[in-house]
């Protein structure tokens, strides 16, 4: 089972919070102190909380649950996509569109349009159009791919959200709360931990820290999924590789 040690976290700078003047007092229980006007996160709290979150992600994945990775800030964009793809899960790494979860019906229509445009771009339909029309459609395709490409095969609401930066992704968290979808989130010293089921106090800006969280989460999900496949193989539902 994937776990992350105190040493891993120190090396990735997980303990560096935000400047003290930007703090959210609700994060006080997770703060060790301050150094040079920057809050230091108490990793003795973070290590067990993160490892508990990994165990839970593993369980959800072993029950065939769908995990949606969310991170739209610059330091997370690439890492979120890589992590989700590495464990066959889903992601949103560009702007979170309001209603992405709470208005799933409408989102499903847009996904259908995205898939239609994808086939048109591959089956030669674009070549038969006027230059202007082809350009308009490929622009629409690009836009839809950017916002929905990571969830186009999700086939319904996710069973959990794994969020980088609770403050930045507060709309996604609120939608998940409204629908009773559990939220795992990296919560920095400037963020509000309310509404988060699995709080992971940590630096949400440093690329190394972001990669550490995502790699560990993806590994936990992969291991959970392989348990599920192993069980199915035992029951003769799938062929073991």
From Swiss-Prot:
Name the UniProt key words of this record, in alphabetical order.
Ribonucleoprotein, Ribosomal protein
Per the UniProt record, one Pfam family is: Ribosomal_S2
Tell me the GO BP annotations in alphabetical order: translation
Statement: the UniProt record of this protein carries the keyword Ribosomal protein: yes
What InterPro entries does this protein map onto? Ribosomal_uS2, Ribosomal_uS2_bac/mit/plastid, Ribosomal_uS2_CS, Ribosomal_uS2_flav_dom_sf
Provide a GO CC annotation, any one: cytosolic small ribosomal subunit
Q: Which GO terms describe its molecular function?
A: structural constituent of ribosome
Sorted alphabetically, which PROSITE patterns does this protein's record hold? Answer: RIBOSOMAL_S2_1 (PS00962), RIBOSOMAL_S2_2 (PS00963)
CDD domains reported for this sequence: RPS2 (cd01425)
Q: Does the keyword Isomerase apply?
A: no
* HAMAP family named in the record: Ribosomal_uS2_B
Q: Which family does it belong to?
A: Belongs to the universal ribosomal protein uS2 family.
**What is the name of this protein?**
Small ribosomal subunit protein uS2
Q: Which organism is it from?
A: Proteus mirabilis (strain HI4320)
Gene name of this polypeptide: rpsB
């Amino acid at each position: 089972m994937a776990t992350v040690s105190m040493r891993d976290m120190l090396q990735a700078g997980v303990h560096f919070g935000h400047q003290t003047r930007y703090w959210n007092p609700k994060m006080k229980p997770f703060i060790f102190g301050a150094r040079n006007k920057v809050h230091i996160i108490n990793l003795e709290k973070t290590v067990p909380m993160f490892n508990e979150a990994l165990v839970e992600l593993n369980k959800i994945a072993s029950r065939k649950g769908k995990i949606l990775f969310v991170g739209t800030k610059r330091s997370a964009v690439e890492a979120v996509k890589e992590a989700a793809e590495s464990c066959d899960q889903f992601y949103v790494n560009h702007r979170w569109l309001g209603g992405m979860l709470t208005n799933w019906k409408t989102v499903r229509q847009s996904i259908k349009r995205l898939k239609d445009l994808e086939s048109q771009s591959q089956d030669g339909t674009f070549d038969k159009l006027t230059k202007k029309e082809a350009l308009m459609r490929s622009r629409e395709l690009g836009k839809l791919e950017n916002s929905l490409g990571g969830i186009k095969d999700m086939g319904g609401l996710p069973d959990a959200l794994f969020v980088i930066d609770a403050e930045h992704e507060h709309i996604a968290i609120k939608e998940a709360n409204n629908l009773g979808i559990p939220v795992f989130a990296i919560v920095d010293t400037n963020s509000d931990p309310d509404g988060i089921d699995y709080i992971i106090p940590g630096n949400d800006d440093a690329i190394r820290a972001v990669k550490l969280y995502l790699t560990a989460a993806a590994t936990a999900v992969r291991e959970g999924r392989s348990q599920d496949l192993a069980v199915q193989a035992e029951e003769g539902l799938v062929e073991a590789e």
